[in-house]
Design a protein with these regions (language model features):
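Extracellular glycan-modifying ectodomains
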Residues: 1-242
Length: 242
């Protein structure tokens, strides 16, 4: 997932103020590890929180680069850890063709399949989000979805391949649905935040970055949607007969 969503999720889980990069127990480039406590009293559980930067979710075994993109190994650690795990993944902005995205998505799904998943494991794949040309000119959300649609063309979409993001998301939805019909079944879900994010030309970093958002802001709403999905899964586990 994007770093700003990782920050948002960490702050919701940990309930600690400040920048998570300054309080995490271990930091190695873009590998962040920390522990958060979920629940209270006798129900409290220590949960390990990890963030890996891997722009295309590759199954590399060593840290590597391709131009400006960084790839930190994550697959071995994910597969080897026997504890119940929630994997939250995202890919899109650093892939620039349909063929490359299909290949990367297929590789990611193979990596997920390597894990001997328990009934408590969960996988959530978050969709790519829309960029907004001339974001510095916006200070409030669009009032109607069509306002984004009328403005989504232009040089920024073409030069950064933002026009491919809806196609990437269709591929992701197809692969997640296929996996849900297989061995992993109902333990995988798509977190679709494209449409809701298209309403927000504002709140972005700006100054040349019209894709990423400031915090607090839009990524916090992605986190809220994630928590709704987790509550849905939790409710199903509670209702499941023993």
């Amino acid at each position: 997932m994007q770093w700003n969503m990782a920050q948002s999720l960490w702050k919701v889980l940990s309930k600690q103020p400040g920048d998570p990069t300054k309080v995490h127990s271990k930091r190695n480039g873009k590998i962040i590890q920390s522990q958060v406590i979920c629940g209270t009293g006798s129900n409290a559980r220590h949960v390990q929180f990890k963030f890996f930067l891997n722009n295309r979710l590759t199954n590399c075994t060593d840290r590597s680069w391709e131009g400006p993109f960084e790839f930190f190994p994550w697959v071995h650690e994910y597969v080897a850890d026997a504890r119940p795990t929630l994997l939250l993944a995202h890919m899109g902005a650093h892939v620039h063709s349909i063929a490359a995205y299909e290949e990367a998505m297929a590789s990611f799904m193979r990596s997920v399949a390597l894990r001997n998943s328990s009934s408590l494991d969960r996988v959530i794949f978050r969709t790519a989000t829309p960029g907004q040309a001339s974001c510095d000119d916006h200070s409030r959300p669009f009032p109607r979805p069509i306002d984004f649609e009328l403005r989504e063309g232009g040089l920024s979409n073409i030069s950064f391949h933002w026009d491919l993001h809806p196609l990437f998301n269709s591929i992701a939805a197809r692969e997640i649905a296929r996996a849900a019909r297989g061995r992993i079944r109902d333990r995988i879900a798509l977190l679709d935040v494209y449409q809701m994010t298209s309403m927000r030309p504002d709140g972005r970093r700006g100054g040349g970055d019209c894709l990423h958002f400031l915090l607090p802001g839009v990524p916090d709403w992605w986190t809220h949607k994630l928590l709704v999905q987790l509550r849905h899964w939790a409710a199903r586990l509670v209702r499941r007969p023993s």
